[in-house]
């Protein structure tokens, strides 16, 4: 397969996009580094609070006019944005690979999912409709309408720099709101590319703004009285203890989609070959840096004696290790590569510390990600190979805490009840999957497991754009989720009108 050309050369000097203008920042500038090559590809400003405030002011100024814009007119802008994204599909995908490190196939998938968010949001004339009832009393009618609220803030994560802000922004804009997006300062280029296309699509000045920055911009967003709601995707400590708490204190609407420790449950009737193939993507896709990544593979011996469970467990683990060992590692623009680097050195050190902790706590290291081969001559700084532990118990650190890297824990349970208890012993509730041919086991699993996204013979339980991206327990803080009808409700207020004519 070919090694693809990079979509741009040199070092990009990024700016903020506020009120339809590209604006320089007075803040310091930080390097954006390609984690595969360790070359600086851009410099991003760490904007000031005043610069964020200016973006909110611009959005507030245009909001009344944008709100009054007919839904079909708003939709035409979004439909044009979708068309432009399709035209620039490959460029947008390669940018993600350069700035994040994921493989080009993963980037193309992310681009497609992001475009689908815009596509679904173009259905807003129907999605935003209210409802009515005549003659609730003699000569009196009642109906509900949905109205936008104002300006929303969106805080993007590093792991999906293109897609995640699009879980929210198209729905907010389609319903008549304005947005200020703060991309991750680690990989902000994708959001700059999106807003360039939004400008070309005819979205009015001030409706869709991008302000780069760090904690100071987040803090300004959480405290600003002009921000009606905040959408956050990131770690549980930040989401729960900072964003959720401070939005509550200031009366903002909030979506906090947070961390995870997802289980994949393998029942005795599962097709091992197909299950393992699905797990390669769900455990090691995006180098394990996603909230829907599976982390613990739980082999279940429902109806088996101890010896049979041990034999089944061995068959599954051996197949998993063998498949993991064949994953090719390198620069994601090489189409033969199946796994790229972690985002930066700090994340590598974090993952390595968990690998060592697993060894220290007595788990068996079947595949050591500290020892790996690259398919080409690259700096090894940000790479870690697939790592597989077996004989992992629920109390071990690697089984309990979110590693956010390519580390798989092999575990076993004697029954489906025991497996569900093990899942519930973890504080997270983002996703869980079961592999089985039994409808009875699958229904029991999906009915009882306290996770927001359930996969049945699906490794990555990723909802489509017209369904909400759910989450429970320490994986989600808020009331409504992003995507689909719940996003429409989040970005609008319900107004009830009761009328009588004399």
Where on the chain are the PLM-derived regions?
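Hydrophobic face of amphipathic alpha-helices that form TPR/SEL1-like repeat modules
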Residues: 1-37, 370
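Residues at or immediately preceding the N-termini of alpha-helices
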Residues: 35, 49-52, 71, 89, ...
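Residue-level signal for inorganic ion chemistry
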Residues: 38, 74, 96, 176, ...
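Conserved C-terminal structural/oligomerization subdomain of aldehyde/semialdehyde dehydrogenase
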Residues: 39-42, 203, 227, 265, ...
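Glycine-rich loop-to-alpha-helix module at the N-terminal edge of alpha/beta enzyme cores
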Residues: 39-129, 139, 328
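Short, well-ordered beta-strand elements within core beta-sheets of diverse protein domains
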Residues: 41-47, 62-68, 154, 264-267, ...
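Rossmann-like NAD(P) dinucleotide-binding subdomain of oxidoreductase/dehydrogenase enzymes
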Residues: 130-275, 309, 413, 478
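ALDH superfamily catalytic-core signature
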Residues: 229, 237-393, 417, 456, ...
